[in-house]
């Protein structure tokens, strides 16, 4: 009878049947071994990419970044005022572009505030209403016309 070999666990199962494989693959040790295998594989891929990028940069195939430090002995061109930085002599300081950075909201919003929307692929919270679908506005059911008042006590009678 053939045996089933698990590459992740480096072991043979007692026999090759779907129930034995299913039981093995749902086990804690097997899942940990699979996770470790792919984690090591990702680390190797990242290191390989870093090594290739470093080698290409050292060979001059990748130009230095435009805002890197200038080579020694060359004059540095000041950045335009729109990029910020300290004001230069004789120049007005640039106005701040925006307020302080927003802190991510932790927990539920304050009472009375509803979240604006949901991220792509996210479900709305329990009890929340689904957003309206785009399309023509819905018709209201017919009602009696409202009475308009021009001044207090002066009501137009309903016709």
UniProtKB/Swiss-Prot annotation:
GO BP: mRNA 5'-splice site recognition; spliceosomal snRNP assembly
UniProt main location, coarse: nucleus
UniProt cross-references to InterPro entries, sorted A to Z: Matrin/U1-C_Znf_C2H2 (IPR000690), Matrin/U1-like-C_Znf_C2H2 (IPR003604), U1-CZ_Znf_C2H2 (IPR013085), U1_snRNP-C (IPR017340), Znf_C2H2_sf (IPR036236)
Zinc finger (Matrin-type): 4-36
Subcellular location: Nucleus
A GO cellular-component term linked to this record: U2-type prespliceosome
Phosphoprotein as UniProt keyword: no
Region annotation Disordered: where it falls in the sequence: 63-95, 139-159
Keyword Lipid biosynthesis attributed: no
PROSITE patterns: ZF_MATRIN
Compositionally skewed regions (Pro residues) per UniProt: 77-95
Gene Ontology MF: a single term: pre-mRNA 5'-splice site binding
Top-level taxon in the UniProt lineage: Eukaryota
Cross-referenced SUPFAM superfamilies: beta-beta-alpha zinc fingers
Keywords assigned: Metal-binding, Nucleus, Ribonucleoprotein, RNA-binding, Zinc, Zinc-finger
Subunit record text: Component of the U1 snRNP. The U1 snRNP is composed of the U1 snRNA and the 7 core Sm proteins snrpb, snrpd1, snrpd2, snrpd3, snrpe, snrpf and snrpg that assemble in a heptameric protein ring on the Sm site of the small nuclear RNA to form the core snRNP, and at least 3 U1 snRNP-specific proteins snrnp70/U1-70K, snrpa/U1-A and snrpc/U1-C. snrpc/U1-C interacts with U1 snRNA and the 5' splice-site region of the pre-mRNA.
Function: Component of the spliceosomal U1 snRNP, which is essential for recognition of the pre-mRNA 5' splice-site and the subsequent assembly of the spliceosome. SNRPC/U1-C is directly involved in initial 5' splice-site recognition for both constitutive and regulated alternative splicing. The interaction with the 5' splice-site seems to precede base-pairing between the pre-mRNA and the U1 snRNA. Stimulates commitment or early (E) complex formation by stabilizing the base pairing of the 5' end of the U1 snRNA and the 5' splice-site region.
Family classification: Belongs to the U1 small nuclear ribonucleoprotein C family.
HAMAP family (alphabetical): U1_C (MF_03153)
Name of the protein described by the UniProt record: U1 small nuclear ribonucleoprotein C
UniProt source species: Xenopus laevis (African clawed frog)
Gene expressing this chain: snrpc
């Amino acid at each position: 009878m053939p045996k089933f070999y698990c590459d992740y666990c480096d072991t043979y199962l007692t026999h090759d049947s779907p129930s034995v494989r299913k039981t093995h693959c749902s086990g804690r040790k097997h899942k940990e071994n699979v996770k470790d295998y792919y984690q090591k594989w990702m680390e190797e891929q990242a290191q390989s990419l870093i090594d290739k990028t470093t080698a290409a940069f050292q060979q001059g195939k990748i130009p230095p970044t435009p805002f890197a430090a200038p080579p020694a002995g060359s004059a540095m061109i000041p950045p335009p005022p729109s990029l910020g930085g300290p004001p230069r002599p004789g120049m007005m300081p640039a106005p701040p572009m925006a307020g302080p950075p927003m802190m991510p909201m932790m927990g539920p919003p304050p009472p009375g505030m509803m979240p604006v929307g949901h991220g792509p692929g996210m479900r709305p919270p329990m009890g929340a209403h689904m957003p309206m679908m785009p399309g023509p506005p819905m018709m209201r059911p017919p009602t009696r016309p409202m009475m308009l008042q021009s001044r207090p006590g002066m009501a137009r009678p309903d016709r």
